[in-house]
Amino acid sequence: MRENNQSSTLEFILLGVTGQQEQEDFFYILFLFIYPITLIGNLLIVLAICSDVRLHNPMYFLLANLSLVDIFFSSVTIPKMLANHLLGSKSISFGGCLTQMYFMIALGNTDSYILAAMAYDRAVAISRPLHYTTIMSPRSCIWLIAGSWVIGNANALPHTLLTASLSFCGNQEVANFYCDITPLLKLSCSDIHFHVKMMYLGVGIFSVPLLCIIVSYIRVFSTVFQVPSTKGVLKAFSTCGSHLTVVSLYYGTVMGTYFRPLTNYSLKDAVITVMYTAVTPMLNPFIYSLRNRDMKAALRKLFNKRISS
């Protein structure tokens, strides 16, 4: 067990995305471009949904909450990375590292459960349209969002506390641009067998929403293919296409990072984490708005209102 005074002075070195200065300069410019787009894009989604009464329904309520989580999610890591690069420093305190890890796990899990809630919403809308307003009532939507936040934080807390109990002696270079649980476990000189088992349990909890999404879309597609109208099938696929794209991007990159043995992790994997920590939150507003006429109309209305005022 580490001494209290040691934990207060312990610092980690964030190696960045690649560890090569020339490439780090490229990623600095990339993040400098990505971060404001992420903030503005997701904030516009939230404002458009709040300002347009036609979008005050469960589907857009869940989307607005997803956009808020994406804003927080990208803000946990990118500002620190930009500040470190600008100041020529790569250090992060032990407390700052634990805080970053906690919010990454909590927000990542919350994001995945909201995606599952959105899939459930689509399944109910398509397979049980007559009961939609009853099942997806305002109270149900609030419970879905609250449950997502509770599960996300409940999954993050034990991992953070367990990591706080570890001893770190010798190499303190984190093979990533933020404090992730995998490189931290590899740095520890404590017995991490229990911690690794808990990490994979956490991965299992994180995978539950994916199972819910798969079940929801099996229900959607089984209902859709029973519809004789080709127009109805195309409309259903158009409605679900954006969500499926986001789910594929998010879970595809996350699974590439965490669904494998701890010993296989290296700095090369930091490039994969850029996809779900930075790129996916930036793309979400575009994916959900470009193919959605109601969202595009709400955004135009929002812009016109700002210009006229």
UniProtKB/Swiss-Prot annotation:
Please give, as recorded in its UniProt entry, the membrane topology of this protein.
Multi-pass membrane protein
Stretches assigned to the Cytoplasmic side: 50-57, 121-139, 219-235, 291-309
Which processes are annotated in GO (biological process)?
Answer: signal transduction
Keyword Transmembrane helix annotated: yes
Residues modified by glycosylation:
N5, N264
Cellular compartment(s) = Cell membrane
Keyword vocabulary terms for this entry: Cell membrane, Disulfide bond, G-protein coupled receptor, Glycoprotein, Membrane, Olfaction, Receptor, Sensory transduction, Transducer, Transmembrane, Transmembrane helix
Assigned GO CC terms: plasma membrane
Disulfide bonds listed in the record:
C97-C189
Which terms does the record give in the GO molecular function aspect? Answer: G protein-coupled receptor activity; olfactory receptor activity
Q: Main localisation, per the record?
A: membrane
Ranges facing Extracellular side = 1-25, 80-100, 159-195, 259-270
Keyword Ligase among record annotations: no
Q: Which parts pass through the membrane?
A: 26-49, 58-79, 101-120, 140-158, 196-218, 236-258, 271-290
UniProt record similarity statement: Belongs to the G-protein coupled receptor 1 family.
User: What's this chain's function?
Assistant: Odorant receptor.
In Swiss-Prot or TrEMBL terms, this protein is called: Olfactory receptor 1A1
- Source organism (scientific name): Homo sapiens (Human)
Tell me the gene name.
Answer: OR1A1
